[in-house]
A protein has these predicted regions:
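Non-heme Fe(II)-dependent double-stranded beta-helix
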Residues: 1-129, 135
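Acidic, His- and aromatic-enriched active-site or binding-groove loops in soluble protein domains
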Residues: 128-148
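Short acidic/polar capping segments at secondary-structure boundaries
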Residues: 116-123, 133-134, 156-160, 170-173
């Protein structure tokens, strides 16, 4: 994982919109239609107080001044990582993680989205307080798990200085007025929030309805977090959604099955790498055993796969 992530970071566009990497070679993502690499000014808050991501980040985080000589911008996030990293794909197929997803969201669980957050020391951008969900807040069937959850695998671990903070219990309180919470606190330091602190290799879980965010990484420690998100099938089937991670669409059964093939490819990629491990049995695609083999054709098939994310 460390080698793969380092290789992806090295081949990222040198700046927003660039087609070359820092070494002048062809950048990853240059031929993708889906959003892939995101850049921001060092220690800035690119989302807070804007209409981006459906305006779900209503308040702005404090933006420390970067050190003299800092670059004008830095890459802090990339989406669709399973097409760029075989190690990330194999992580996605981890039988224990998928078993947890099934236990939480049911055996017919679906994908949501994958992302890798890169918080370089002294450079990493903040992520303003928000709740991930945007679709089902007014549903009479809303409960504490309606908008799914994210696994957050930590490559180097995370600290209070560079990690995600979360407001415990907020996932069960519906849509909250985050701007009012910040105003009541008198700053972006919400007194109710606690940090997610992990060692290298730990995997945290975060409910997508929880109020959470992270401060600019003014620390000396790097954080790399691999997010793997999952939904209940009932929360996405025939639902009109999108607009944050993917274009608005109605998620019919065909789209869900098409997107879920990434789980099957990941399971097979992991089976090839770890033949003595018992692979996860993914029920929704069990009707076509052997259909999704990880090979060169599969690699071509998942190009731009995140165009079909299932964002709610």
């Amino acid at each position: 994982l460390e080698r793969d992530i380092a290789a992806v970071v090295a081949r990222a566009p040198v700046r927003a919109g660039a087609s070359v990497d820092a070494a002048g070679g062809p950048a990853l993502g240059r031929d993708c239609q889906a959003p892939t690499f995101f850049h921001a000014r060092p220690l800035s808050d690119p989302f807070g107080g804007t209409d981006l991501a459906n305006g779900r980040h209503p308040s702005r985080m404090f933006e420390p001044a970067p050190a003299p000589g800092a670059p004008a911008e830095t890459m802090y996030l990339f989406l669709g990582p399973l097409q760029f990293s075989d190690a990330c794909l194999r992580l996605y197929g981890h039988p224990q993680l998928l078993a947890v997803a099934a236990a939480v969201n049911g055996d017919d669980f679906t994908p949501f989205n994958e992302a890798v957050w890169v918080k370089h020391p002294g450079l990493g951008a903040s992520v303003a307080w928000h709740q991930d969900g945007v679709t089902h807040w007014d549903s009479p069937d809303l409960d504490a798990g309606t908008h799914g959850f994210n696994f957050m695998a930590q490559l180097y671990g995370c600290t209070a200085a560079n990690g995600v903070w979360v407001v415990p219990g907020s996932h069960a309180q519906g849509k909250l007025d985050i701007a009012a919470l910040v105003a009541a606190a008198g700053s972006e330091r919400l007194p109710q929030a606690v940090p997610i602190i992990c060692a290298p290799g730990d995997v945290a879980m975060c409910n997508r309805q929880a109020v959470h965010g992270s401060f600019a990484n003014a620390s000396r420690d790097t954080r790399v977090t691999i997010n793997l998100g999952f939904h209940r099938r009932a929360a996405v089937l025939d639902v009109a959604a999108g607009g944050v991670h993917n274009a608005p669409a109605v998620y019919d059964a065909a789209r869900i099955r098409h997107r879920a093939r990434l789980i099957a490819y990941a399971i097979d990629a992991r089976r090839q790498r770890f033949p003595d491990e018992v692979p996860f049995h993914y029920q929704p695609l069990a009707d076509a055993p052997g259909r999704w083999r990880w090979n060169a054709a599969a690699r071509a098939d998942i190009h731009d796969y995140n165009l079909h994310d299932l964002s709610i």
